[in-house]
Amino acid sequence: MRDHTDEKSEAAGNDDGHVRIGGLPAFDPDDPAENAVINRLVGNWHRRAAVKREEPDVYALFDPGRPDFREDMIPFRGHPIWERLSDETRSRLLSWGWVAYNRNTVLIEQRIANPAFELVIGGAYPGLGGQQLELAVAQAMVDEQYHTLMHINGSAVTRRMRRSDFSDRVLPDSHITTIHQEHLDRCEEPWQRSLTTLGFATVAEISINAYLDLLADDQEIQVVNSTTVKLHNRDEYCHASISGEMMKQVYEALPADRRRFLLEKVVAGLEAFVAPDFTTWESIVAFEGVPGWEKAAAEVREAQGGTHLVQDHSGIHTLLTEMDVLDQVEFGWGTTVTR
């Protein structure tokens, strides 16, 4: 957990060579792509940073010949309908994939992670409290706002450079935020709502690295896209440790029935987090007017139902093992390897 009690210099270096300015994500001052993303995030960054030299902006880094997203992350990719698409339509679907990925990330931050942090600061959970925790959680909330802006910027770059709207209004709420809301709607007591959000947020904050890893180190997609995700990813390793400790402390302070309830919500959150978002992709191909999409969508759902887009479940597996409750939950861990 970061120590936020000491005064920080405006630009501070880390042992790994990354620089953190204020609340911005840590970045490599020698990496042009990372500098460009940070520069986009805060317009006057180059006047404040320790390294003051001209760096390319995000638009200069854009390569029209590179895909915006990973083709193998599109559910329709393995269906014959994909082979019948024109190169132009495939390219548009890959751009949509990046925009939808960003929107899902933003919705997770705004509707699940930050609401849980707000509940912590508001004293909703037993076993939690104290200045150090409040400072760490408040800083995490600031981080999440930067992450939100980074991903909104990421979509904005794609829209400008591809000269197309790719409007978020075309997209439904993401799968995990929809499932989270469904669980909230079934709650009858305030404690149920707060524990539901904690369960889903714990999954999101601990498993988000696995989701971001899907693009962070990809060498084929747009450099600015993978770099945006990479910068976000670094902060989330810290958030994972904070969320894991909060989960342990709250669980220990709960009576048996509420412990069971919380574990049920962790499993529900994990199932929603790792699943492919069929509804979003159906909305995309419908909007794009892909011929035969309805039949293809039904076949894809049947073939891929129960599969996991995010294959790495090790974060939650490790947490539940440390809590000595792994045998109390039912989840298809597959070949999960603990870290």
Curated annotation (Swiss-Prot):
Pathway info: Antibiotic biosynthesis
Renumbered residue ranges of the record's region Disordered: 1-22
EC class name: oxidoreductase
UniProt GO BP: antibiotic biosynthetic process
Molecular functions per Gene Ontology: metal ion binding; oxidoreductase activity
Residues the entry annotates as binding Fe cation 2: 144, 205, 236, 239
Positions bound to Fe cation 1: 109, 144, 147, 232, 236
UniProt xrefs under Gene3D superfamilies: Ribonucleotide Reductase, subunit A
Domain of life where this protein originates: Bacteria
Compositionally biased region (Basic and acidic residues): 1-19
Catalytic reactions of this protein: alpha-N-dichloroacetyl-p-aminophenylserinol + AH2 + 2 O2 = chloramphenicol + A + 2 H2O
Cofactor: record remark: Contains a nonheme dinuclear iron cluster that stabilizes a peroxo intermediate.
Stored Pfam families: AurF (PF11583)
InterPro entries: AurF/CmlI, RNR-like
Keywords: Antibiotic biosynthesis, Iron, Metal-binding, Oxidoreductase
Required co-factors: Fe(2+)
Known EC number: 1.14.99.67
Family: Belongs to the AurF N-oxygenase family.
Role played: Involved in chloramphenicol biosynthesis. Catalyzes the six-electron oxidation of an aryl-amine precursor of chloramphenicol (NH2-CAM) to yield the aryl-nitro group of chloramphenicol (CAM). During catalysis, upon exposure of the diferrous cluster to O(2), ClmI forms an exceptionally long-lived peroxo intermediate (CmlI-peroxo), which reacts with NH2-CAM to form CAM.
Protein name, per record: Alpha-N-dichloroacetyl-p-aminophenylserinol N-oxygenase
Organism annotation: Streptomyces venezuelae (strain ATCC 10712 / CBS 650.69 / DSM 40230 / JCM 4526 / NBRC 13096 / PD 04745)
The organism's taxonomic lineage, starting at the top: Bacteria, Bacillati, Actinomycetota, Actinomycetes, Kitasatosporales
Gene giving rise to this polypeptide: cmlI
